């Protein structure tokens, strides 16, 4: 797990989610054949965020992309019959259907969910590609609209910044993200 995932996990915990990191989905051989690839490795969900009172689990893909151009809307809008690329769960409906169904069953088998648990796919991005002559945050807004239209959750860099800022108002904890928030926003520190 990388540090960016750790920050997102802390932000989710601050919003009353229980977080599980690097969850391997136990896709069966039969399910692998259903998605067109019989030798794929077990899919790994970066973060599972369980909100018990809502009976909801968000399966987060976490991409920092801080040293790259960032998440591109065009990459998320691609549709693949057989999964490929960096956003497989978002761009291949058949793969998503199989993996999320198996994930839900795995969670039920582990006592972490029940048949009524709502399972949602989410993306947290540390950086979003921004076109040169475009107002700031345009691409983030377009990505959010696109993902929400498909019933996915999207945390843009701006959303993450606001959540980090809100951490400054939390009581002190020996957590790097909370300490950093308190250093960056001392006026909000309690």
What function would you assign to each model-found segment?
Residues 1-190:
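Intrinsically disordered, low-complexity Ser/Thr/Pro/Gly-rich regulatory segments
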């Amino acid at each position: 797990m990388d540090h960016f995932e750790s920050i997102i996990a802390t932000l989710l915990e601050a919003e009353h989610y229980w977080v599980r990191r690097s969850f391997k989905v136990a896709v069966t051989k039969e399910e692998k054949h259903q998605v067109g690839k019989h030798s794929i490795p077990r899919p790994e969900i970066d973060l599972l965020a369980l909100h018990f009172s809502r009976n909801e689990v968000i399966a987060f893909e976490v991409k920092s992309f801080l040293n790259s151009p960032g998440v591109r809307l065009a990459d998320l809008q691609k549709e693949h019959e057989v999964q490929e690329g960096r956003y497989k769960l978002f761009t291949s409906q058949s793969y998503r259907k199989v993996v999320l169904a198996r994930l839900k069953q795995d969670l039920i088998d582990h006592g972490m969910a029940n048949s009524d648990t709502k399972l949602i796919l989410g993306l947290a991005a540390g950086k979003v590609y921004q076109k040169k002559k475009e107002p700031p945050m345009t691409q983030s807004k377009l990505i959010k609209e696109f993902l929400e239209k498909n019933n996915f959750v999207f945390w843009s860099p701006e959303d993450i910044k606001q959540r980090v800022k809100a951490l400054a108002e939390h009581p002190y904890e020996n957590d790097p993200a909370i300490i950093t928030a308190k250093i960056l926003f001392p006026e909000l520190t309690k």
